[in-house]
A protein has these predicted regions:
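Mid/C-terminal beta-alpha module of Rossmann-like enzyme folds, strongest
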Residues: 198-256, 279-290
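Conserved Rossmann-fold NAD(P)-dependent oxidoreductase catalytic core, especially the SDR/UDP-sugar
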Residues: 83-128, 151
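Glycine/proline-rich active-site loop of Rossmann-fold NAD(P)-dependent oxidoreductases
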Residues: 134, 147-148, 158-169, 201-211, ...
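N-terminal Rossmann NAD(P)H-binding glycine-rich loop of SDR-like oxidoreductase domains
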Residues: 3-23
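A conserved pocket-lining segment of Rossmann-fold NAD(P)-dependent short-chain dehydrogenase/reductase
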Residues: 172-190, 194
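Glycine-rich NAD(P)-binding loop of the Rossmann-fold in SDR/ketoreductase-type enzymes
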Residues: 72-83, 123, 127, 131-132, ...
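NAD(P)H-binding glycine-rich loop region in Rossmannoid oxidoreductase-like domains
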Residues: 37-90, 105-107
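Active-site Tyr-X1-5-Lys
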Residues: 124-151
């Protein structure tokens, strides 16, 4: 049985991974630890085989460029995971999984100009969130060796029942709008159960390295809004002819490019083993909305 400590009690991903691993009785013993304050330093890690570090400050538009928040991002997203990993290694933990982000690449995709992230794409974070995560990666990866395996996960948008963030905006569109722009774009996203299954496989394998999870299918924003509406028992009509207006609006409103641009991981970059996507895109939307 693998003994796992999730550092970051109450985090969406940590909570969902714990629930997912509970479906495999007798294989995993999972605990959570709140990382607020200094009390965690008194916790012994000697009873654990694996630490999954999910604690962190999430990406917030209101703070991502504010200089007043730079120190806080560094303390929580860089210094904390490094301190946890150092303690884990010193106390005999065998594997450390760090939840990073696609934002370490610092890429945006203006509508009509697709961007594909490959193994050769350099890191170029552009805000406090991305920079703090990239800085943590730079300090964690050299700690990896035969007895202490460090795995870095760089998920794109994560969604599932109870999630927050960008998916919530799509839910709002699907719930309120009778029509929605038809745009031919593609984006990488990952359903929480698919992410949890990858984490489970990484734990089973004692894997180390950098992993960029995504669903087996790229997401089209317009189709996803329509599918969410359908799962809610509504119908949203997709109407073409708005691309020029969205391109113009995207020049002034970054959120437009985030919603309708094409930003994807290369398939080969996301491959692992025989696969980890336990749910299709269609299945994941139905499960999220019901």
């Amino acid at each position: 049985m693998k003994r796992i400590l999730i550092t970051g009690a109450g985090s969406y991903i940590g909570t969902q991974v714990k629930a997912y691993l509970a479906r495999f009785p007798g294989q995993y013993a999972v605990s959570e630890r709140n990382m607020h304050g200094e009390g965690w330093t008194e916790t012994s890690f000697r009873d654990y085989d694996v630490i999954l570090h999910t604690a962190g400050i999430v990406h917030r538009e209101s703070t991502k460029q504010d200089p007043a928040f730079e120190t806080l991002y560094t303390q929580v997203n860089t210094d904390l995971p490094v301190c946890v990993a150092e303690k884990a290694k010193a106390e005999g933990v065998k594997q450390f999984l760090f939840l990073s982000t696609q934002s370490v690449y610092g890429l945006t995709a203006p509508l009509g100009k697709p961007v594909m992230i490959t193994k050769d794409t350099p890191l170029n974070p552009v805000d406090h969130y991305g920079r703090s995560k990239a800085a943590a990666e730079a300090k964690l990866l050299p700690m990896s060796d035969a007895s202490f395996r460090v795995a870095i996960l760089r998920p794109p948008i994560v969604y599932g029942k109870g999630c927050k963030g960008n998916y919530r905006a799509l839910q709002s569109f699907a719930s309120q709008l009778p029509v929605f722009p038809l745009v031919q774009n593609q984006r990488s996203m990952v359903y929480i159960e698919n992410l949890a299954e990858l984490i489970r496989q990484l734990i089973d394998d004692g894997a180390a390295g950098i992993f960029c999870p995504q669903n087996d299918e790229y997401t089209n924003t317009s189709r996803m809004v329509a599918d969410i509406a359908r799962a809610k028992g509504r119908r949203v009509m997709l109407v073409g002819g708005f691309t020029w207006a969205l391109k113009l609006l995207g020049s002034f409103v970054p959120a437009v490019n985030k919603a309708f641009g094409s930003l994807c991981y290369d398939r080969q970059l996301s491959a692992y083993g025989s696969g980890y996507c336990v749910k299709t895109l269609a299945e994941s939307i139905v499960e999220t909305e019901t």
